[in-house]
A protein has these predicted regions:
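Carboxylate-rich, polar loop motifs that coordinate divalent cations or form catalytic acidic clusters
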Residues: 1-290
């Protein structure tokens, strides 16, 4: 490992080192969403540049320093969507000091300003998971559609507090919420809640789903506050496999998943990083060596 601490030498160091999201652009730069704004890291010279309200490089009150989500669409690789706790900001990565646009709940474009995850559905539509519902935003017409939870509607979200989004190869959008998993078929405009139970007669588990990761196989991986779940998304009545300490997971609160270029699955937890050993069907702690 190489450690990078203290991004900037001022009073906000601790907040800046709490990284919420990372995104790489086509020029090799890393963009970091932190508790103290947006940073760009240049790996060629190990330099950081901060973009936040106090530095006036993003001179509008739409942009809040807490950045939860970063997203660069494949079809527009020079656009960076920045999801903060007070709305959405669109940047051109070639000129990030000049925001191209903003979107806030007050403008009628968001279900809530606190954005947790951003995802492209197609070339013109963005999905924005927020702390109070899901927004489908048309980037051409600037029109928005909202999806909420409703106790009287079994085809609605299980909870309005959303955490993560993932789109699979069949264009099904999987949604991680504070009350479990849902999937959205935008062609049918239908949401299905997914029962997370291994027993058809058993009580459904209302787990907090922090992150989602899909193929190469048919498994949908979920990180939760009760370990890691592997769910077979191809089987309608499928249960799940749970990975906790007995399966090598370092901490029951599992946060983030990523698959590297070699196909290895990496897991971030509240107590370190693990990787998945497929041959043994268990996670192994990645030890830090100085």
């Amino acid at each position: 490992y190489i450690n990078y601490f203290v991004l900037v030498p001022d009073a906000f160091d601790r907040m800046a080192n709490e990284i919420r999201s990372i995104c790489a652009d086509r020029h090799g730069m890393l963009w970091l969403g932190t508790f103290d704004g947006l940073y760009r890291f240049n790996p060629t010279d190990n330099s950081f540049v901060r973009y936040e309200t106090r530095s006036r490089k993003l001179p509008n009150d739409t942009y809040n320093n807490l950045v939860n989500a970063l997203y660069i669409p494949e079809n527009t690789p020079d656009l960076l969507y920045v999801g903060s706790s007070s709305g959405l900001v669109v940047l051109d990565i070639r000129h990030p000091e000049q925001p191209l646009g903003t979107l806030r709940a007050e403008d009628g474009g968001l279900t809530d300003n606190d954005i947790k995850s951003i995802l492209s559905y197609d070339d013109t539509h963005l999905l924005l998971a927020t702390a109070d519902g899901l927004t489908l935003y048309d980037t051409r017409s600037c029109q928005a559609s909202a999806y909420y939870s409703s106790l009287s509607d079994p085809t609605s979200l299980p909870n309005n507090s959303l955490r993560t989004l993932f789109r699979d190869r069949q264009n099904i959008v999987w949604i991680g919420t504070d009350s479990g998993l849902a999937k959205l078929d935008l062609k049918r405009k239908k949401i299905d809640c997914v029962r997370l139970t291994n027993d058809r007669k058993g009580a459904e588990r209302k787990v907090i789903v922090n992150d989602l990761l899909g193929p190469p196989d048919h498994s949908l991986w979920l990180t939760t506050n009760e370990g890691v779940l592997r769910y077979d998304s191809t089987r309608r009545d499928a249960g799940y496999t749970r990975y906790m300490a007995d399966k090598g997971v370092s901490h029951s609160i599992a946060k983030r998943l990523i698959r590297d270029s070699h196909g290895t699955l990496w897991l971030g937890t509240n107590d370190g990083i693990d990787y998945y050993d497929a041959a043994r069907d268990r996670f192994v702690r990645a030890e830090h060596s100085n």
